Amino acid sequence: IVSALDRWLADAVQPAAQRWFGVPVAEIRQISAYSCRGMNGQPGARISEHAFGNALDIASFVLADGRKITVRDGWRGSPEEQGFLHDVQGAACEQFTTVLAPGSNRFHYDHIHVDLMRRASGNSVCNPDAVPGDVVAARVAKERGYAWRRGDPGVTGSIGKVSAVPKEKLKPSFKKKLKKFFAPEEDDDDWVEDDGPRPRDD
């Protein structure tokens, strides 16, 4: 799996990060690699590729400038986040024999699972179907638009930036919401190693 990951990182993840965010990926955070268990952590299920050290669950990408793109939030996040994540998921489908991302089932809502399972049929699994990031980002931008309503402080579709609206014009309650929205996430390195749903902190 290591050589497939290296190819995917070099050929797809880094170019996609440069394209969508203008900086490379500095770190990939995984939530499960080797784990001797059944598929999706379910008792009685077929043995998981994780049990063979042949799978990886990717939860987030940390960019060189410190921004963190989580699969859980970014899959339905800004056009840039969605475009990036769909591009890397689609490219993963070319490198791995199994790719499961949000929308595939309830166990993969917060990560992209990749493995090199060998099937007698020779078939691969790419679920949900790969859609180019450009297509996804254009659809999201069209649905959401980048214009804002009167009185809105003008949060743009890009992550981590707020347009130049004087702070004195913001209502106190909205200042609080913005502060919470842009607060750094808590470190999630303490996730347990399974594919089951994790409670959200919010």
Show the residue positions of the predicted features.
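Active-site acidic/histidine clusters and adjacent loop/turn architecture
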Residues: I1-I28
